[in-house]
């Protein structure tokens, strides 16, 4: 059976984000629905747009570095923010799990699941 990995990424039952230096370089439809934004509104943006504020973005960014350095995987439950749509700026609880592709530079590239 041939596997279409792009289709699997796009249709995954959880939100998926590919990041590079804490910027969104790819996301699936589920993330777009969760955050109330079109893909072209998210790709190219700092992940900061998904957080309720700059302080929370910085706090979580600093907190996950030693954990990703140690084991390459990080998970938590956190408050995130809708980007656009009729619920713009509404906050919601989200379970986030991520894996870095480089433990020595954890923000360099990663994949993140949002549930």
What does each model-found stretch correspond to?
Residues 25-27, 33, 51, 74, 81-83, 87-92:
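PAS-family sensory domains
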Residues 114-115:
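PAS-associated C-terminal
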Residues 19, 86-91, 95-111:
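Short loop/turn elements at sensory-signaling interfaces that couple input to output
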Residues 31-43:
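PAS/PAS-like sensory domain cap-loop motif
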Residues 54-82:
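Terminal output helix/cap of sensory domains in signal transduction proteins
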């Amino acid at each position: 059976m041939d596997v279409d990995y792009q289709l699997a990424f796009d249709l995954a039952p959880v939100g998926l984000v590919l990041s590079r230096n804490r910027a969104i370089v790819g996301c699936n439809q589920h993330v777009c629905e969760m955050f109330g934004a079109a893909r072209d509104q998210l790709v190219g943006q700092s992940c900061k747009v998904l957080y309720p504020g700059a302080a929370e973005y910085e706090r979580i960014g600093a907190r996950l570095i030693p954990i990703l350095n140690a084991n390459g995987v990080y998970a938590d439950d956190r408050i995130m923010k809708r980007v656009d749509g009729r619920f713009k700026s509404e906050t919601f609880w989200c379970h986030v799990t991520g894996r870095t592709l480089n433990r020595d530079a954890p923000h360099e590239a990663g994949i993140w699941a949002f549930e």
